[in-house]
C-alpha cells in the first residue's frame, strides 16, 4: 500500500484545537455553568458547513482529551468532524441521577432537570453561536455515564448517540435496567456505548446485568455497543474509553478503511446508505474530501481524486489543505499547470491564515514552479 506522504504532513499539529469559553446562568438547575468549546480545525474553511455536536460531561477533566481524540480521528475520516463542548455541574449526584434515593433525599433524582438544561438552555445557546448540525453525541463517566445511559432510553431526547464510560448503573437497585426492560422501542435511531474498567462489586455486577438485558431483549431503533477495559481503573478508563467509544459508534464511518478507493458518486451512495442507521444524512466534510481525494489519487485513480478534491474546494473554498491536495492530485494526473494554479491558491490562503502547514505548502509550490518552468523551457527549444 502506498504511503500518503502529503496526507501525513497535515496531521502533525491537529490537536491544537481552537478553544472558546463562555458561561450560562441557568434558570433550570440554579447554577452558572462554564462551557468550553473546541471548534474543528476546518471551521473557518467554510462559512456555511455545519458540524455535529459532542457534549462532554465533567468537562473540567474530560474535555481536553476527548477534544484531542476527536480532532485526531476525524482527520483520518474515522469519525465526523465535530464541535466538542465540555460542561460541568457542581452537583453531580443531584443532576446525574434519574431517581431520588432514600439515603440522598433532596440531593438526588433530578436528572430530568439537567436534561432540561441541556435541551432548553445549552443546545439553543450553542446553536445561536456556532454552526451546529442536528446530530448530537453526549459522553459521561461514572455518574455522568449513568446520566447518558438514562438519556439513551428517553424518547423525548434530542441526542442521537450516547457514551457511558464505567456508568454507575447500580444506582437505586439498578433502576435504569427496569427502565430498559419496560421500553419496547425508541421513536428515532439511537446509539449507546457502554464500557467497564477493571472494577469490582456493584459497578461490575450492574454492568453485566445490563448487558444481559440488552442481549435478551432488543429494543427497536437502539444500536448498542460495549467493551471491557481490563487494563484500566475507574479513573484511567475515560482516556482510552472515549476514543474507543467514538470509533465504535462510528465503526462503519470510513468509506475506504483499507486499500480500496471510491469515486465521488460511490462515496455519496455509501453515506446515503448508512444514513438510516444513524438517523441523519451527513454531508462530506473537508477532511473527508481530503482523505478520499488524496487516497484515490495516490492509488492510481487520479481522475477520481481530482473530482473529489475539486468538489471539496467548491464547498470549502478557504481550505489551504484542500487546495494543496488538489495541486497534488493535478500533478499526479499530469496536469502541472493546473497543479501550480491550485498550489498558488493554497499558498495565498496559508499566508493569510498563518497556517501551520505553510512550510509544506510552500515546498510543493516551489517544486511545481520549477516543474512548470522546466516544461516551458523545453517547449521553447
Language model region names:
Residues 5-17:
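Hydrophobic h-region of N-terminal signal peptides that target proteins for export
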Residues 18-333, 340-377:
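Non-catalytic cap/lid and distal C-terminal segments of serine-dependent acyl enzymes
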Residues 8-9, 64, 380:
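A ubiquitous, low-specificity "background" feature that marks scattered single residues
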Residues 12-13, 373, 380:
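Intrinsic disorder/low-complexity segments in short proteins, especially the signal peptide
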Amino acid at each position: 500500500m502506498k504511503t500518503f506522504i502529503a496526507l501525513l504532513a497535515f496531521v502533525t499539529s491537529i490537536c491544537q484545537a481552537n478553544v472558546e469559553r463562555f458561561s450560562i446562568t441557568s434558570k433550570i438547575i440554579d447554577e452558572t455553568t462554564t462551557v468550553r468549546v473546541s471548534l474543528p480545525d476546518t471551521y473557518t474553511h467554510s462559512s456555511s458547513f455545519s458540524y455535529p455536536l459532542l457534549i462532554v460531561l465533567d468537562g473540567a477533566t474530560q474535555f481536553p482529551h476527548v477534544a484531542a481524540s476527536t480532532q485526531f480521528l476525524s482527520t483520518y475520516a474515522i469519525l465526523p468532524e465535530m464541535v466538542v463542548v465540555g460542561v460541568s455541574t457542581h452537583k453531580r449526584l443531584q443532576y446525574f441521577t434519574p431517581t431520588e434515593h432514600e439515603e440522598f433525599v433532596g440531593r438526588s433524582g433530578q436528572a430530568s432537570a439537567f436534561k432540561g438544561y441541556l435541551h432548553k438552555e445549552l443546545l439553543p445557546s450553542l446553536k445561536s453561536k456556532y454552526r451546529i448540525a442536528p446530530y448530537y453525541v453526549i459522553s459521561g463517566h461514572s455518574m455522568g455515564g449513568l446520566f447518558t445511559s438514562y438519556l439513551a432510553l428517553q424518547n423525548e431526547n434530542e441526542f442521537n448517540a450516547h457514551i457511558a464510560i464505567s456508568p454507575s448503573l447500580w444506582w437505586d437497585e439498578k433502576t435504569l435496567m427496569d427502565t430498559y426492560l419496560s421500553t419496547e422501542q425508541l421513536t428515532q435511531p439511537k446509539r449507546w456505548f457502554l464500557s467497564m474498567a477493571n472494577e469490582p462489586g456493584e459497578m461490575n455486577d450492574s454492568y453485566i446485568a445490563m448487558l444481559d438485558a440488552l442481549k435478551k431483549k432488543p429494543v427497536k431503533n437502539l444500536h448498542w455497543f460495549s467493551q471491557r477495559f481490563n487494563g484500566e481503573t475507574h479513573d484511567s478508563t475515560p482516556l482510552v474509553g472515549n476514543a474507543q467509544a467514538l470509533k465504535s459508534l462510528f465503526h462503519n464511518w470510513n468509506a475506504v478503511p483499507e486499500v480500496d478507493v471510491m469515486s465521488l458518486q460511490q462515496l455519496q451512495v455509501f453515506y446515503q446508505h448508512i444514513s438510516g442507521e444513524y438517523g441523519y444524512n451527513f454531508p462530506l466534510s473537508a477532511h473527508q474530501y481530503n482523505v478520499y481525494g488524496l487516497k484515490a489519487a495516490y492509488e492510481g485513480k487520479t481522475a477520481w481524486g481530482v473530482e473529489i478534491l475539486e468538489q471539496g474546494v467548491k464547498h470549502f473554498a478557504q481550505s489551504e489543505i484542500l487546495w494543496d491536495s488538489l495541486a497534488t492530485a493535478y500533478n499526479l494526473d499530469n496536469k502541472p499547470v493546473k497543479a501550480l494554479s491550485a498550489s498558488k491558491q493554497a499558498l495565498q490562503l496559508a499566508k493569510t491564515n498563518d497556517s501551520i502547514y505553510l512550510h509544506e505548502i510552500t515546498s510543493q509550490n516551489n517544486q511545481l514552479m520549477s516543474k512548470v518552468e522546466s516544461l516551458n523551457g523545453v517547449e521553447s527549444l
